[in-house]
A protein has these predicted regions:
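Membrane-proximal periplasmic segments of bacterial cell-envelope enzymes
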Residues: 1-272, 276-297, 333-334, 339-342
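Solvent-exposed coil/turn segments that connect beta secondary-structure elements
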Residues: 36, 58, 66, 73, ...
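Short alpha-helix boundary/capping segments
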Residues: 89, 308, 580, 651-659
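Solvent-exposed, polar/charged alpha-helical surfaces in well-ordered, non-transmembrane soluble domains
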Residues: 91-99, 201, 205, 209, ...
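Amphipathic, well-packed alpha-helical segments that form the structural scaffold of globular domains
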Residues: 245, 273-276, 284-287, 317-325, ...
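Conserved, well-ordered alpha-helix/loop/beta-strand core segments that scaffold catalytic motifs
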Residues: 289-341
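Flexible helix-coil linker/hinge segments at domain or subdomain boundaries
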Residues: 672-681
Length: 688
């Protein structure tokens, strides 16, 4: 039997239902009737736009994970043209903003290449500015040869700049209007105009507190350099030029993208550059962001580790600077002539560059802080921007003699037991008027009866003239190429290939015949041979390891942005080999050992009492025209278990023996650092 429903319960449920209906109706009334107008106005005045979200660029690290270059975020001010030019007096607003920027100690970007006050004249222009001004003159219907005064007159009229403004204020307004306008001229391919880069909070606050319209704050990344070392290797970034855009646009780059311009930043652009994202940004009537919804998340660039050891790079730069400046400070007739130089150190087993130093160098952190800074560095007489280690080309002098020795031994021209009498003069062609001398002849003595090992120790010209006379020059050139001399090294940065002296090279350079004297001079590292310090270091490493020449790539690994995923690991690549017997290698290596460890050796004074046994070769490259000789020095250590090969070049350094101390200072640091960095590299990378 069913229980009867009590009337009280029915009444209670009915009351509860009625109460809920009343609450819903009241809420609906408030939403649509009371607050409806406000919501309508807010929605009507809200603006949603799709914006690009810049991706962070990848970091650059040394071989042990120490950060060399990373990013720092900054606030930029950009103009909102739709808002700015809806105002009654946009020119007045621009002038107000420019004055506010100056009062806050910030600087703004003015692309107009015209002086700041009359009489107006064009200023010096870079390539981008020239393209920009040509495009604007064409747009304006002005002649390409229009004067700055004619251009300013056009700007005053075109941009409706009131005559009440002073000439200086008119120039400020014209510069900003020009900078904005050129972004909308077809086919100029200019990056987005950023009014103030890395704006201070004082500036942003001042503009907002004064309700200055027409601008927006965006966030971007700038490169932060954690070291003042390796400036020539790291390189720098910048906005694309119109020419660069034609290449990068096929890869999906926007015109406003920042790209690598030089060094590792350029070489490894494909890894370092991230992929921008997009977001829907909603702003209310006052311009305040009320919502951000990512439609595509930005993907940051990858983390690139170089083969360079930061500690060794520091040691290389310090040793080179100290050595050259000491040479300059000496009161000798040649001290004023001492110029720039380079030191390169590579791993014998892999060919990986561990340090690449140049003198003079520069500081990437300050180079682009102002036009004055850049001009001072770029126009300096001693060329600090020139990468001597990779682009400098120098005659190797006697450092080439081990190559001649290997060629002679391998081709059977000599054996390890062959002895050649040094008489001070090579007389074979004396009847033709050509009788080159050994360097020691000026002292009134000779080297005696040398074998190949002793000839390397003594650097006897007569011995190597004899070998060179018996070797076809193209055969000697083939061995030089196998050692990497006059060949690409495999480094990812711009480099000179140099040249080995041959009949074809002389014909190309001078359109004259090849003579026997050319072969003799080529055999001792003179003639037309020119090599880079990096090539000399890799050549020395090839001697040290018994004939295997590796690529000089500076890329070690590529990891994901946070370092959690290994994307690419560079393995040692063999570029060529020098095939000869172990006996031949031992004879040449022993000769280099004696250079540093026998009292008759030219580097004995520097390395005779050194704690690690070193093998070395000094070189003096004659320049002619009464110029002071270049000094060349190569070495590897330890002699019995080679780990590192070093090449040092000092322009007008007089003689190779005089710069051996630079290499010694570097090796002091190398063997100190080596005891510190003994943990496996995989473990060290986890400690970063």
């Amino acid at each position: 039997m069913e229980k009867p429903i009590k009337p009280g319960r029915v009444a209670a449920l009915a009351c509860l239902l009625a109460l809920l209906v009343i609450v819903f109706v009241v809420a609906l009334y408030k939403l649509q009737i009371v607050d409806g107008k406000a919501y309508y106005e807010e929605n009507r005045n809200s603006v949603a736009s799709s914006q690009t979200v810049e991706a962070a660029r990848g970091s650059i690290l040394d071989r042990y994970g120490r950060v060399l270059v990373s990013n720092t975020s900054c606030n930029n001010l950009i103009f909102n043209p739709d808002d700015l030019f809806e105002q009654d007096d946009p020119n007045g607003i621009l002038l107000q903003m420019a004055r506010t920027v100056a009062s806050c100690g910030d600087t703004y970007v003015d692309d107009l290449p015209v002086t700041s006050a009359p009489p107006f004249a064009y200023t010096d222009m870079n390539d981008t500015q020239r393209t920009q001004i040509r495009g604007f003159l064409k747009y304006a219907g002005l002649d390409e040869e229009a004067t700055a005064v004619e251009l300013m007159s056009y700007c005053r009229e075109k941009f409706e700049i009131n005559n009440n403004y002073s000439a200086a204020d008119m120039r400020i307004i014209a510069g900003l209007r020009y900078s904005i306008k050129t972004r909308y001229i077809d086919k100029l391919y200019l990056p987005d105009y950023v009014f103030v880069k890395d704006a201070s909070m004082e500036l942003i606050t001042s503009l907002k507190e004064n309700n200055v319209p027409g601008f927006e704050v965006t966030v971007s990344y700038t490169r932060q350099y954690h070291t003042n070392l390796a400036a020539h290797l790291l390189g720098y970034t910048g906005l694309m030029t119109a020419e660069e855009y034609t290449t990068y646009k096929t890869q999906g780059y926007p015109m406003s993208a920042t790209v690598g311009k030089d060094g590792a930043e350029l070489a490894f652009e494909k890894y370092l550059h991230g992929t921008n994202g997009t977001a829907i940004v909603t702003k209310n009537a006052s311009g305040t962001v009320t919502g951000t919804t990512y439609t595509t998340e930005p993907e940051p660039g990858d983390q690139v580790s170089l083969t360079i050891d930061l500690d060794l790079q520091s040691a290389a730069e310090q040793s080179l600077t100290k050595g050259i400046e000491n040479m300059k400070s000496k009161s000798t007739k040649n001290s004023d002539a001492v110029g720039g130089g380079a030191l390169v150190a590579v791993a014998v087993a892999t060919g990986q560059p561990l340090a690449i130093a140049n003198y003079p160098t520069f500081d990437l952190q300050t180079l682009f802080q102002s036009e004055e800074n850049y001009k001072a560095v770029s126009e300096a007489d001693n060329q600090p921007l020139f990468n001597r280690a990779l682009l400098g080309q120098y005659s190797p002098g006697s450092t080439f003699k081990p190559c001649t020795a290997i060629a002679g031994l391998t081709e059977g021209v000599i054996t390890t037991g062959t002895r050649i009498q040094c008489t001070g003069t090579f007389r074979k062609y004396e009847d033709t008027g050509y009788a080159p001398k050994c360097w020691i002849a000026s002292s009134g003595v000779t080297h005696g009866n040398d074998n190949v090992t002793e000839a390397i120790r003594d650097s006897c010209n007569i011995f190597f003239y004899t070998v060179g006379d018996s070797l076809p020059i193209d055969t000697l050139a083939r061995y030089a190429a196998a050692f990497g001399l006059g060949e690409h090294t495999g480094i990812e940065l711009p480099e000179s290939t140099g040249q080995m002296a041959t009949e074809a090279v002389k014909k190309k350079l001078e359109n004259t015949n090849w003579y026997v004297g050319d072969s003799l001079q080529a055999a001792i590292g003179q003639s037309y041979s020119l090599f880079t310090p990096l090539q000399l270091a890799e050549y020395c490493a090839t001697i040290a390891n018994g004939g295997t020449r590796h690529s000089a790539s500076i890329l070690k690994t590529v990891r994901s942005y946070d370092g959690s995923e290994l994307i690419y690991e560079n393995e040692a690549e063999v570029l060529s080999t020098v095939e000869t017997s172990d006996y031949n290698w031992a004879a040449v290596q022993k000769g280099m050992y004696l250079v540093a460890n026998d009292r008759a050796g030219s580097a004995y004074e520097t390395f005779g009492d050194y704690g690690v046994k070193v093998a070395a070769k000094t070189g003096t490259a004659q320049l002619g025209d009464n110029q002071v000789n270049n000094a060349i020095f190569i070495c590897y250590a330890p002699y019995d278990n080679p780990k590192v090969a070093v090449a040092v070049v000092v322009e007008h350094g007089s003689a190779g023996a005089s710069i051996a101390s630079i290499a010694r200072d570097f090796l002091d640091a190398y063997f100190t650092v080596k005891t510190v960095n003994t943990a496996p590299e995989s473990e060290l990378s986890l400690l970063q």
